[in-house]
Regions:
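Terminal leader/tail segments of proteins
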Residues: 1-113
Length: 113
């Protein structure tokens, strides 16, 4: 895991704003009594992940199927889920997401881990 990814995850743990180079973490508290805070992760100003107060992680490559995007998303997945059964990988130029040991093709859009 890269240093910037460790710092990104620490910001999520601390529930604090973080910005370094091309990576940013923000805290969003929606209005409403039952609303839960979210930690949002951005890469080059693209919203690539949301981590909720109840431990849910949603990921999105935003059309940027790059090594850096995959690395940021995998570090988040490893933070919240078993890395031996969950993650993102590329095969024959296509992205796949593994959830609980099952592989799925990963089209653009949001995916819950």
């Amino acid at each position: 895991m890269r240093k910037i990814e460790r710092e990104m995850i620490q910001a999520i743990i601390d529930r604090s704003y973080f910005k370094k180079a091309n990576t940013k973490v923000t805290v969003v508290v929606p209005k409403g009594a039952d609303s839960k805070a979210e930690m949002r992760v951005y890469l080059h100003d693209n919203h690539i992940a949301t981590y909720t107060d109840d431990g849910q992680l949603f990921v999105n490559h935003c059309g940027w199927e790059t090594v850096t995007t995959k690395s940021r998303l995998n570090s988040l997945i490893n933070f919240v889920a078993d890395p031996t059964k969950n993650g993102i990988y590329q095969k024959n130029y296509k992205w796949f997401i593994t959830r609980n040991g099952v592989d799925y093709q990963m089209p653009q859009g949001w995916h819950q881990v």
